[in-house]
Amino acid sequence: MIKKLFTASLLLTTLSISTLSAQSTPVNNESFLKNQISNIEIKLICEDLEIKETYGDEILIEVYCNNRKKAPVIECKNETLYISSKVNFTVFGFICKVKVYLPANQKFSNVKIEGTSSDISIDSLYSEDFYLDTTSGEIECTNLSIENNSIITSTSGEIDIEEISTKELTSKTTSGEISFGKISCDTATITSNSGEINIDDFYGEYFKVNTTSGEIDIYNIDTEYFTAGSTSGQISLDFKNIISAKSQIKTTSGEINIFVPKNSSFNVAVSSSSGTFKDKISGNRLTPRSEYIQKYNEGGAQMTIRTTSGNISLED
């Protein structure tokens, strides 16, 4: 027993030393002039990735790991920077982090990042198109400025974006929370099979949010129209400006809370199989088993609100 404990302790100590050594000095350094690179393609198996800004004219890559032979491969071909994991090696005990420093305000044509079991952190990035996916790992981004399309997905891990500006946004996680600070876009589609969706500020023409199991909370909404749905979870939407086109909210099992600006002109069509509608604007409280339609002020775009089992609240 003592021998087993000693062996386990020795293994943990060895891994700890390896961790410390992996973080101290890079095992590989590469640099490229910024005009050499128009695209970035990164594909990692287990290495973590950090992308940071630098105030120079070079793109710098540093690799920190506890086994030089297993370090990812770095190369530049046809104006594309490639960083990729080596294949067919044992990942147990292997610790690695790739740091990429990009010149401030450099815009790329396309950035594609894939991680199997990798945490990915991005401070600032400018690109025409952007694709980011992890199978098992967290995604954290501070500022993304994407001219066209942005796709951000994770199979099992959280997605946390402070600010993103893009034309079309698609974000999805199978199991994990999705959080956005500020979104500025034309259209956004955000889905989670099992996890909450939180957005602090949304500006765009249209958004669609859906979660199978988890709450949806969106604040400071400025949009023309939207679709929101949840199978099992509460939906709370807080509008900065009222909608201008038909929109829909639907949940199978969960409350719906809607907050609109005072004196807004719009219509609602509300129904609930088992629940109460609290209309705090007109002071009504009812159980709308069939569709209940109400016009506010001059009337306007219709917001359809449906729940199978849950209360509905509307207030300004």
Show the residue positions of the predicted features.
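Intrinsically disordered, low-complexity terminal regions
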Residues: 1-316
